[in-house]
A protein has these predicted regions:
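N-terminal presequence-like segments and the immediate start of the first folded domain
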Residues: 2-95, 101-154
């Protein structure tokens, strides 16, 4: 009996405004007919050297956390930029971010400020992202932890 591919939406590669998708850098994957997401990508494709962070929190260089959620996010994103730079990656090489937050309502109430902080650090590059609410993080005062994956083009 012949096997046929399942019917479903087709996949499009959407040009990314900050990345040359024709030759290097990640490509945004967007199924045709799906609404464009705001502030993230549904999927990414990339070829190159993988740079992966552990769970990163918003510690400053003295090991202190900001007292507020947006301050912790800003420092966390800055820490991610510093870590991936050690692997010769730039923010535009990010293909995935997984956010862990202890209070999703705090996240939702801060979207405008979070977007501003994100763009200041990573620009207008929006990789695939997931947001997960957790009961707490290992560091008791931490409000957010983010894992990042970047792919440095060959």
């Amino acid at each position: 009996m012949p096997v046929t591919a399942p019917k479903g939406p087709t996949l499009s590669v959407v040009p990314h405004p900050k990345t040359d998708t024709s030759s290097s850098g990640p490509q945004v994957l967007q199924p045709s007919g799906w609404p464009m997401p705001k502030g993230y990508a549904n999927g990414m494709a990339a070829d190159g050297r993988l740079v992966v962070t552990g769970g990163v929190i918003g510690w400053d260089t003295e090991g202190r956390l900001a007292p507020d959620f947006v301050g912790q996010v800003r420092q966390t994103l800055s820490n991610i930029a510093d870590i991936i730079a050690e692997g010769d990656a730039k923010p535009e090489h990010l293909v995935r971010l997984t956010w862990y937050v202890v209070d999703i309502e705090e996240y939702l109430a801060s979207l405008k400020e979070l977007g501003r902080a994100y763009r200041e650090i990573f620009g207008a590059h929006y990789p695939a992202m997931a947001l997960v609410q957790v009961v707490r993080l290992v560091e008791k005062e931490a409000r957010v932890e983010i894992e990042a994956t970047a792919v440095v083009p060959r």
